[in-house]
Amino acid sequence: MAGQVVQYGRHRKRRNYARISEVLELPNLIEIQTKSYEWFLREGLIEMFRDISPIEDFTGNLSLEFVDYRLGEPKYDLEESKNRDATYAAPLRVKVRLIIKETGEVKEQEVFMGDFPLMTDTGTFVINGAERVIVSQLVRSPSVYFNEKIDKNGRENYDATIIPNRGAWLEYETDAKDVVYVRIDRTRKLPLTVLLRALGFSSDQEIVDLLGDNEYLRNTLEKDGTENTEQALLEIYERLRPGEPPTVENAKSLLYSRFFDPKRYDLASVGRYKTNKKLHLKHRLFNQKLAEPIVNTETGEIVVEEGTVLDRRKIDEIMDVLESNANSEVFELHGSVIDEPVEIQSIKVYVPNDDEGRTTTVIGNAFPDSEVKCITPADIIASMSYFFNLLSGIGYTDDIDHLGNRRLRSVGELLQNQFRIGLSRMERVVRERMSIQDTESITPQQLINIRPVIASIKEFFGSSQLSQFMYQSNPLSDLTHKRRLSALGPGGLTRERAQMEVRDVHYSHYGRMCPIETPEGPNIGLINSLSSYARVNEFGFIETPYRKVDLDTHAITDQIDYLTADEEDSYVVAQANSKLDENGRFMDDEVVCRFRGNNTVMAKEKMDYMDVSPKQVVSAATACIPFLENDDSNRALMGANMQRQAVPLMNPEAPFVGTGMEHVAARDSGAAITAKHRGRVEHVESNEILVRRLVEENGVEHEGELDRYPLAKFKRSNSGTCYNQRPIVAVGDVVEYNEILADGPSMELGEMALGRNVVVGFMTWDGYNYEDAVIMSERLVKDDVYTSIHIEEYESEARDTKLGPEEITRDIPNVSESALKNLDDRGIVYIGAEVKDGDILVGKVTPKGVTELTAEERLLHAIFGEKAREVRDTSLRVPHGAGGIVLDVKVFNREEGDDTLSPGVNQLVRVYIVQKRKIHVGDKMCGRHGNKGVISKIVPEEDMPYLPDGRPIDIMLNPLGVPSRMNIGQVLELHLGMAAKNLGIHVASPVFDGANDDDVWSTIEEAGMARDGKTVLYDGRTGEPFDNRISVGVMYMLKLAHMVDDKLHARSTGPYSLVTQQPLGGKAQFGGQRFGEMEVWALEAYGAAYTLQEILTYKSDDTVGRVKTYEAIVKGENISRPSVPESFRVLMKELQSLGLDVKVMDEQDNEIEMTDVDDDDVVERKVDLQQNDAPETQKEVTD
């Protein structure tokens, strides 16, 4: 028997065909959300208050500091927030200190700064009652970037950009004459040396001494018209502020505020880290030949002699000296923007491949402290040096699509940025109030206006592109939505501008971003998914784990290192399937490995790391596709995406052929209920589980407190499916931490169960499975195999109107008693009622404008005392195709103190209708390999082809769907599934390390099936065997959310467009079907003139004609001739609006009046129309 039996959770054993043992457990799959939010609450908020403190007034007398903060208790708990359409949030209270410097008085106060949304345990937010997910954003990291470009003459050129987190960009570029220019904040370019002079390097000689002599620098100095620091400052000021009178002081303060003011310019810690990494000497001297010795500046000792070529070992040896003070120089700058001395490290090296022995100076930024978030003069000088080095062939350009240069902004950082915007708006208000208020009586509360902070947070959660309504179709869709990475959004790319290169798979995605799972369509490659083992480090770079190879013994160690993409570039990484002996040494002398994106074979001694698992390349959803290695990537993409659209079934079933990921995905998705502590189950019922904690102290286990786990029963999910949890533990069970206690939707025994295992035959059947269509047995309908439950929510509000309040009532004008049979005495439908399209759910009347009563009516009202009820029926009715059973009714009243109702609403009624949808012709089905199709026919069970033992098969698929699509995985799944069913086992075939051909065929033989996996099938209609043996097996098929019930739509009459008077389009608007240009040609070709005429008039925009037609049909009379369509009159008006005098003339050249006809006129003149049906009359009466 191939494979070994592995336990997945408490209830499921699977035969696992993996050959590689798991060295590292999968991390918690939603920690990308939870960890980031925890960081925000722990550090992010404090960091922001620290950045903004203290706020001082313009005189410097008042100072406001933010000391500390605390979060209070949420007003409503999670369930209550969802029920009341409220936000699950806690009050944020900040301790604020006001210091009045004149008197030395200190006032401390706790200030309420709005309700702050809290993250649920499952990584979501509840905003206005709906669950939302904040998607992580993939953006360019702040750093220094060097780019290679070809100019219009075909010459190789370079440009460079210093990109901060916020602040002005600094760009360097060369022109055709080899002059180097700088652009400050996208303005006009200046010679580079102007900026250097402005920094305090006044003379040409100082600049040459600093950067080293080269022709680019000489050309730039010739172009430079300034001669000293003051002139350079004035030149820069004129470029940045044209039209203002330049002074040296103004120029200094402008340059300071652009680059050196922490409030205006921020590299962020990640920018400082990347800049140091790029510009420091230790990263730039690799493989360079020294033209001067490296000296320890403190001791004067020569560390490395001139002429030495620095390899990696040599650099490691002198690392301490390089990081401290090797060849350091300090410049005292006079008349500069910054008063402090500038420290740099500079070393001359020989230009590579140069016969003349020319040298160039490599200048490093002498490692500014990681706390320095601004750019420093040393950074600017070092970046200029790097640029000149590039022109000499030293250094390398950056690949912007490399994941070392792209980072993630997760929830915490996105929230922090948004909060910062609110705080900076608030800061302005505080400053203004400080100058107005009386200092004696002033308090922090009076100074602070929290509106801008609350507004910016609300705006972020409510309308940001990255705050998305959670796609809650099944546990997998929950999970992948939380692990999604988007390159779109504020500060990111836009769909239209994103080029092929950004969207493409990059070698640095390996183990970090899934190469398979991305949407089809305009967002392809811009929205990605995090790989299964990936994690995000403190700087926002994605790391992936590798097993460390011991450099001495060349054996794999137990140490696991997480590497970012640019760290990985320095190492050789072996594949996870490399063969190892019992000591962890590579068995083959040559090992398949990766180095900087090249897949190659190297000697085993050169290995530095090894992959932890074959599935570390792919995301959680892709890792759920068995035999992924046998599928074409395009189809695997569809398979991964379609699993997310599977509808939760009434009786779900875990797959016979899984990958072992089903249990993990179900546990981490948040749809299941998991134990928060180890304990013993004390009580189980359908809506609650009680677990007594077991606590160990001094080696003795004793009982602790009781944990209560409420279960969700038949709730509506965000996508209108049924969200229901079922216990899978029994009283007395001892459960471990994080063990599954209750299955959620689309789960069975603690495993994800998106579909059902059905017997499938690859065969044609009377052409019904043409074009990927699916033929299904009626058994799947009768036995509720693919039946799903759908819950829809409808609401009705009673508001205050100008004419009086609306009223929810059973007393509705002009409605028969039979139409009110399902309503209670309040006028609201009762729970359990079966309702059909058009039935009333909530009776509601709205006051109409009061009309003047006649004398007789006034008398009657005076006698009988009855108020004139001028009301209109505005009841909530069941929309078309949405009938079902009323599951629940919720009523919210303002009188009963429901403060969550929006202004002007007195009463809100919510009705939930549940539908049980069996599978239909027209529903979409799919497998896990991108093999999708629509059901074309449901065949009676007795007519389906049957196996030799008499069992009819469930589904027939077209065999032509396999070869051209190259998703052979489905065929292997089919055979292995049949074997597993016959053996009564479940199997796991992990991706890239699953069952191979031999395993499949040996399992088939073990199950007593034919070696080729095929069988004779008999035609259910005739009993005759089919000519050839047919592949029959068990495949896992899903029912997708694209159901025919949601798409089926018909209209007789309905709403019309205001201007053209043509019917609207689409099911949502209850619109008609467009009869377009080509359809008109078809009728013209047939000569069906009258059919065409009525389509273009009555059925479209002949406003008078359609009223008359309706009346004629009701009365059973002949339909009169059509009048002028509205669109013709619109065309006339449009031409008239252009100043063209357009008139309609008859044959005698008399003008035909195109009159405007009111609805009342139409009614009055209908009689005339029927009496006098002459063509002239028709032309006159138009609308």
From Swiss-Prot:
One of its GO terms (cellular component) is DNA-directed RNA polymerase complex. It catalyses: RNA(n) + a ribonucleoside 5'-triphosphate = RNA(n+1) + diphosphate. It comes from the Bacteria. GO terms for molecular function: DNA binding; DNA-directed RNA polymerase activity; ribonucleoside binding. Pfam families: RNA_pol_Rpb2_1, RNA_pol_Rpb2_2, RNA_pol_Rpb2_3, RNA_pol_Rpb2_45, RNA_pol_Rpb2_6, RNA_pol_Rpb2_7. Its EC number is 2.7.7.6. InterPro entries: DNA-dir_RNA_pol_bsu_external_1 (IPR019462), DNA-dir_RNA_pol_su2 (IPR015712), DNA-dir_RNAP_su2_dom (IPR007120), DNA-dir_RNAP_su2_hyb_sf (IPR037033), RNA_pol_bsu_bac (IPR010243), RNA_pol_bsu_CS (IPR007121), RNA_pol_bsu_protrusion (IPR007644), RNA_pol_Rpb2_2 (IPR007642). Keywords: DNA-directed RNA polymerase, Nucleotidyltransferase, Transcription, Transferase. One of its GO terms (biological process) is DNA-templated transcription. The keyword Membrane does not apply. The RNAP catalytic core consists of 2 alpha, 1 beta, 1 beta' and 1 omega subunit. When a sigma factor is associated with the core the holoenzyme is formed, which can initiate transcription. DNA-dependent RNA polymerase catalyzes the transcription of DNA into RNA using the four ribonucleoside triphosphates as substrates. NCBIfam families: PRK00405.1 (NF001616), rpoB (TIGR02013). Belongs to the RNA polymerase beta chain family. This is DNA-directed RNA polymerase subunit beta.
